[in-house]
UniProtKB/Swiss-Prot annotation:
Residues 2-24 are annotated as: S100A10-binding site. InterPro entries: Annexin (IPR001464), Annexin_repeat (IPR018502), Annexin_repeat_CS (IPR018252), Annexin_sf (IPR037104), ANX2 (IPR002389). Annexin repeats lie at residues 33-104, 105-176, 189-261, 265-336. Signal peptide: none annotated. This is Annexin A2. Belongs to the annexin family. GO terms for biological process: angiogenesis; cell adhesion; cell-matrix adhesion; collagen fibril organization; epithelial cell apoptotic process; fibrinolysis; lung development; membrane raft assembly. Heterotetramer containing 2 light chains of S100A10/p11 and 2 heavy chains of ANXA2/p36. Interacts with ATP1B1. Interacts with DYSF. Interacts with COCH. Interacts (via repeat Annexin 1) with PCSK9 (via the C-terminal domain); the interaction inhibits the degradation of LDLR. Interacts with CEACAM1 (via the cytoplasmic domain); this interaction is regulated by phosphorylation of CEACAM1. Interacts with APPL2 and APPL1; targets APPL2 to endosomes and acting in parallel to RAB5A. Interacts with S100A4. May interact with UBAP2. The gene is Anxa2. The keyword Hydrolase does not apply. It may cross-link plasma membrane phospholipids with actin and the cytoskeleton and be involved with exocytosis.
Length: 339
């Protein structure tokens, strides 16, 4: 017998193919879209002496991802060249990184960022953690499919060979994209039981039962875990984030902190990451670019409002202060406005 929860999950999974672009995205489909015209204008911009970056930026940051795929197709038909390689030759630096990122589908983009985080010597754990902790089941399943297509190997295999210990176990469990979907029924008994088990497995005892933490935090739905973390405070003298800092260290600590923040409030999590990428001397452009590109059609409007609420100034203002030239222009278009 199907439970209401299963039926709802099934609906949300089946409906995924036709979901309209998020109402909270800053980049919307362009109304008078004409792929041929855009392709022609980009071709002209690339051929212009010194390259007409402004036109390239104006077009590609003001089209939805699906529309950009159409432009790339039209461009290739016109010129017999691939749009990404034409733009790679024409552009450079951070602007090139933004524009090439915009040409990939969301899953291709995430897959390539994950691959880059594990390539060569040393792992960029920060990027690995951000992507794996913040993507939904559907997104992760699509990333796994595309990763295999692009790199002829499984994402899980690469994670296993690049990480170790409990950190590896946590990343592998999350990367499967198999957590429960949010149901319509709230199970208060299970909420209480999970909260107590998280406490018993950590702060209450000597040493930490990490597998118990991993199973609860990677298997339960987001909605359920939000309530678990609230309930947790009635058992533990520390909240979940403070408990993590007391119990574990290194990459594992970092991963659990990112995960809990994503579960509690994902737009705020990204607002904090954006702020950290721009505060102090120098800009961590990789993080800045990845979030601006990957969230522009998902929840950028929510991220902007959390950013303003917490930091007192707008995300737009920070980007203006921290970047320059056509790179700045591209990021500001993706931001979608000042608050």
């Amino acid at each position: 017998m199907s439970t209401v929860h299963e039926i709802l999950c099934k609906l949300s999974l089946e409906g995924d193919h036709s979901t309209p672009p998020s109402a909270y995205g800053s980049v919307k489909p362009y109304t008078n879209f004409d792929a041929e015209r855009d392709a022609l204008n980009i071709e002209t911009a690339v051929k212009t002496k010194g390259v007409d970056e402004v036109t390239i930026v104006n077009i590609l940051t003001n089209r939805s991802n699906v529309q950009r795929q159409d432009i790339a197709f039209a461009y290739q038909r016109r010129t017999k060249k691939e749009l990404p390689s034409a733009l790679k030759s024409a552009l450079s630096g951070h602007l090139e990184t933004v524009i090439l990122g915009l040409l990939k589908t969301p899953a291709q983009y995430d897959a390539s960022e994950l691959k880059a985080s594990m390539k060569g010597l040393g792992t960029d754990e920060d990027s690995l953690i951000e992507i794996i902790c913040s993507r939904t089941n559907q997104e992760l399943q699509e990333i796994n499919r595309v990763y295999k297509e692009m790199y002829k190997t499984d994402l899980e295999k690469d994670i296993i060979s690049d990480t170790s210990g409990d950190f590896r176990k946590l990343m592998v469990a999350l990367a499967k994209g198999r957590r429960a979907e949010d149901g319509s029924v709230i199970d208060y008994e299970l909420i209480d039981q999970d909260a107590r088990e998280l406490y018993d497995a950590g702060v209450k005892r000597k040493g930490t039962d990490v597998p118990k933490w991993i199973s609860i935090m990677t298997e339960r739905s987001v909605c359920h875990l939000q309530k678990v973390f609230e309930r947790y405070k009635s058992y533990s003298p520390y909240d979940m984030l403070e408990s993590i800092k007391k119990e574990v260290k290194g990459d594992l600590e970092n991963a659990f902190l990112n995960l809990v923040q994503c579960i509690q409030n994902k737009p705020l999590y990204f607002a904090d990451r954006l702020y950290d990428s721009m505060k102090g001397k120098g800009t961590r452009d990789k993080v800045l670019i990845r979030i601006m590109v990957s969230r522009s059609e998902v929840d950028m409007l929510k991220i902007r409002s959390e950013f303003k609420r917490k930091y007192g100034k707008s995300l737009y203002y920070y980007i203006q202060q921290d970047t320059k030239g056509d790179y700045q222009k591209a990021l500001l278009y993706l931001c979608g406005g000042d608050d």
